[in-house]
Regions:
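Short glycine-rich, Thr/Ser-proximal phosphate-binding strand/loop in the N-terminal lobe
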Residues: 10-49, 156-162
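Short beta-strand-loop/turn "lid" adjacent to the catalytic site in phosphate-handling enzymes
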Residues: 60-97, 102
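Short, well-ordered amphipathic alpha-helical segments that serve as non-catalytic structural scaffolds
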Residues: 29-31, 50-65
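Acidic, glycine-rich active-site loops and adjacent beta-strand->loop/helix elements
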Residues: 13, 76-81, 112-118, 144
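Activation-segment/catalytic-loop signature of the eukaryotic protein kinase fold
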Residues: 237-244
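Conserved phosphate-binding catalytic cores of ATP/NTP-utilizing and phosphoryl-transfer enzymes
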Residues: 1-2, 106-135
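General beta-strand structural signal in soluble alpha/beta enzymes
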Residues: 7, 75, 108-113, 169
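A short helix-loop
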Residues: 2, 9-10, 27-28, 129-133, ...
Length: 244
């Protein structure tokens, strides 16, 4: 069996996976970075340290499950495909990927974390054919909230045109700050999602859009956080599942 090794060391997860296209098989190992209770993030130096500790462990676990041949290695090297987009935490994955590819004498490819999000979404949705056609993508995470027009690109897989972005908070930041108000561990997305699944109430929250130009709208998320803060102030953590 032959596969492709992927590595991602972003905030706040160490991730590695092997993809075998002939068998449509994905083996993955990932682990959240440890964030102290009550904290709303990590310094980049701490993130690099934890990635450096966790990545070898995950690669060992992945190797124990995959006994095949690695054809190539891919690694995330920046948050986005934009000038000046940089975070030190990606150096941990890049260093490991360079060493592995060099030792195995296989090709090494660099992609942005955002491209990885988009590719993973297409795979999960069963829309791999979209790699060959233009489509719209919404990247909603802790560090990015953007609407994109995505086109195929032979060199980078995707060419992205920014259509809209948040002006203040990113969606993930709002989620994590609300989670912090409720005393949930950081990052709070998974725990808030669990609480939401238990809720029988429905909330209709629409982002407010403001167009700088006809093709480049912007939207604010801070008002949504204020709404959630007000809600959080009226409930206890015990009853949080009834409101979120």
């Amino acid at each position: 069996m032959k596969g492709y090794l992927g590595i991602d060391t972003s905030n706040y997860t160490t991730s590695t996976a092997v993809y075998c296209p002939e068998h449509d098989l994905v083996l993955q190992k990932k682990k959240l970075l440890p964030v102290p209770a009550g904290a709303l993030g990590l310094r980049q130096s701490d993130a690099v340290f934890h990635h450096t500790v966790q990545l070898p462990q995950l690669l060992e676990e992945l190797s124990a499950e995959f006994g095949g041949e690695i054809r190539a290695v891919a690694v995330s090297n920046a948050p986005r495909d934009a000038e000046g987009s940089y975070m030190p935490c990606f150096l941990a994955g890049m260093s490991a990927a360079r060493a592995i590819a060099s030792f195995l004498k296989v090709p090494l490819y660099f992609f942005s974390h955002q491209s990885g999000h988009i590719a993973a979404a297409l795979y999960s949705a069963g829309r791999l054919s979209y790699f060959e056609r233009p489509f719209y993508a919404f990247h909603v995470s802790g560090g990015t909230t953007e609407a994109l027009l995505v086109r195929p690109n032979a060199a980078q897989i995707f060419e992205k045109e920014l259509l809209a972005q948040s002006l203040d908070l990113k969606a993930g930041q709002a989620i994590d700050r609300v989670g912090g108000m409720l005393g949930l561990p950081f990052p709070a997305g998974a725990e808030l999602d669990r609480l939401a699944q238990q809720s029988k109430r429905r909330f209709l929250v629409k982002p407010s859009m403001k167009a700088r130009t006809a093709a480049f709208p912007e939207f604010k998320i801070s008002a949504k956080k204020c709404f959630m803060r007000a809600s959080a102030g009226r409930i206890s953590l015990v009853s949080a599942s009834k409101a979120f």
